[in-house]
């Protein structure tokens, strides 16, 4: 059976105006995303673009492609945009794709063939490739995602991580859990939340290594900080809303090396801070030992980087990783404060 596949791509773009914050959107990457879709060998599909109150110029770019377009008058976030796209979809399978992600020409064929098998999964999760090789920070981020989110689960058949970079879901399962939670105002953890609710209904998420994508995002330091703080503060609050699952179901914090690394960084900060008030014996030796333990804890990931990206990227990534885990530690603090003190549940 050739299932009809509805590909839903939300996007948000505003013209650059002096004094206005510019959203994270790249018109060139958007064009690559659309071009890749329409090169698909599988032809029984439709494309639904959801403009989340974007500027007209981004819509003009897409005129050469056949698609359905939804123009939202108000920017309410990716969760709401994807829900609106799903309501218009006529396919039996929904594919959610980020606007800066490029898929392979056989991806839709793989999705259709899989759904012809008798199983209770109904959800296929795509994965990031190592490409493209922009700056060293971008290479670190892509490698981290490949390793901690996807590579570590390569030997497993299923995953608890649903990521809307590229995921295929049977439409009946999607609406069974009422779609994405539109309380998430930005592009935060609405995908993880949907994955958890699907799993609660006994729908498994299969990690499909053949569904490799190219993620066209170039990370700078400020963009990196913004994305980490936004997503993982929201992630922490999600765990607090579902306290019974806080240890059972996590994305990054469940990985033992990540958790140990965060604890080591917290200890190091406490020791440095405490040394200002009380001279700690063997202070330098303790710090060196903590750094050694940090590297040892993440040695498999660093070897993974060394083999895939080379020596220089691996060395730089050790520093990025320390900063990354420091931000994760701060996100835990921010999330707890925002949830309990400021009463912000989302």
List PLM regions with ranges.
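Short, acidic, metal-binding catalytic loop of nucleotide-sugar glycosyltransferases
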Residues: 27-44
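A conserved acidic beta->alpha catalytic loop
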Residues: 36, 51-59, 98-102
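Glycine-rich, basic loop-to-helix element that forms the pyrophosphate-binding segment
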Residues: 72-89
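Short aromatic/hydrophobic "clamp" motif used to bind/position activated sugar donors
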Residues: 94
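Conserved donor NDP-sugar-binding/catalytic core segment of glycosyltransferases
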Residues: 102, 106-138, 216
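A recurrent flexible, glycine/aromatic-enriched loop bordering the glycosyltransferase active site
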Residues: 130, 151-169, 185-187, 193, ...
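Catalytic donor/gating beta->alpha subdomain of glycosyltransferases that bind UDP-sugars
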Residues: 181-186, 190-247
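Basic/Trp-rich segment in TM-proximal cytosolic loops or flexible interdomain/linker regions
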Residues: 221-286, 306-315, 346
